């Protein structure tokens, strides 16, 4: 818990922007502020000490424009920079704890230079053949941009795939460097579809 009278509490109150739009209690840390970054990294180190090996850096691209950044950055231009600052803050802690060769985060957003902090996944696709094709194009674009490792939500994230989409996406997804069955409203497990999927 956070001691409300501590210096860390003051950093939290001044440098974490909180909003309930996409999910309750979602907070964005101002990574342009070294104190806020250090506070956040200290929280990650506590989790690593408990055995956590990897962190998912989600929502790095949904940056509000009605905020004031500690370093004075233009809020309209933070869309790409924020994702780099966020992923870098997390990746640096993982490198410190696990070494450069074993540090892995699971990032949804990226910008130029992001390929140095693997792994990235394609975000929230829908459960359709068209979205699977979009995911493939996204992965090819990542590869052409120097990203050696990438992943995606097998079967799509939004909605529930039919058995055909799930099986085709599984075949495609298991050929990637990192595979993940994941969805927002239904389980993505083979036995939820049909015998052939198992």
Model-based region annotation:
Residues 1-8, 12:
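Single conserved hydrophobic/aromatic residue that forms the stacking wall/gate
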Residues 13-15, 72:
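Detector for glycine-centered tight turns/loop "hinges" at secondary-structure junctions
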Residues 41-55, 60-198:
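Active-site-proximal substrate-binding groove within the catalytic cores of carbohydrate-active enzymes
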Residues 1, 29-37, 79-80, 198:
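Short acidic-aromatic active-site loops that bind/stabilize oxyanions
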Residues 17-38, 45-46:
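Active-site loop and adjoining helix of the penicillin-binding protein/serine DD-peptidase-beta-lactamase fold
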